[in-house]
Amino acid sequence: MRHHRYNPDFNFVVEPEDFNKYSDKELLQYCLGATMYMPGIKDFTMKILNKEMLGLTSMVFCFEDACSEELVQAAEQNVLHVLDALSTALDTGVVTYDYLPLIFCRVRNQQQFEHFAEQLTPHHVKVLTGFNFPKFNAHNAEVYLYYLQKLNDKFGEIIYGMPIIEDPEVAYRESRISELVGIKKILDKYKEIILQVRVGATDFSSCFGVRRGVDYSIYDIMTVREILADIVNLFGRNNDYVISGPVWEYFRVSKQMMFETLPTHNIDDCLMKRIPIVNNEIDGLLREVILDKANGFVGRTVIHPSHIKYVNALQAVTKEEYNDAVSILGSEKGGVFKGECGNKMNEVKPHTTWAQKIYMRSRGYGVIENENDFINLFSEK
């Protein structure tokens, strides 16, 4: 896969790199971008093969929230069918890894995970990137990851895990830190097979009976903001784990979301001053993704195809960021020096982890000239 293929005429300063499930984990963990959830009961084979979902590079078949209990068995058979069909298409040259999205399965619980996994064959596994584990906590973490490691050993294939931290024990202040520390201790044992840490802000919000509106970001919800801050504090230190942002619930189905007149301001300026760019639903998403980046999140879960290109476009790195990051990483003497545009101080030691993250994002999503190009990237002029 490669990000931004929907806009082939866009002129990158540095092109994004190709990736697939076998790419080096150091790069791959930054490449998921907008990861779209799909109900496990629906057959998306032809949509995937025909590239009908604009910009789709990673997806999750859901056996949990998007699937009622009585349909789980049928959903399992459907997903096995999709994996089988895609693997056959790969074998026969109908598709290559360059055009096959990263595919994950969000399991319902430990028992359903094992039941589904027992039906997998090597034919399925070569197109399956990994599993998402909902309601992941210090009590079920070892069970999930021990069995996942067994699957890796059984098939001799890399099958990643992505824990979703959304449990009430993390939501509630009195139990949060001990719970997060317990989760991290277990994750650290299995770090080689952990691709990302994901967060469930909708579940966190439900613990307090709140829901952000279309004009607000998740960072405006004080209780949830504190939870996300603690998750980043424990799992984001020294870039130990890549943490993805939570789902944005709002979308507008429109036959045309094109740009007759592109804003002349940069995107941050437009959004923070509430200058309309697309529509309320997409502008709210863009504002939240900008705050994601400021707080260290990379990519996010999406629930509608219209979100994909916006999330992925904003993961691209500006030329100024890129040059600063490369200068910091390439410095042999350390110390302090002026930034690329002469407008900031770059201090090698404290800015190194930031520079590493920027550089990896540049490889996955490319380098653009400046902030104005974000709009050009997702507008498909």
Give the location of each predicted region:
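Expand to "…catalyze enediolate/carbanion chemistry for C-C bond making/breaking, isomerization
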Residues: 1-381
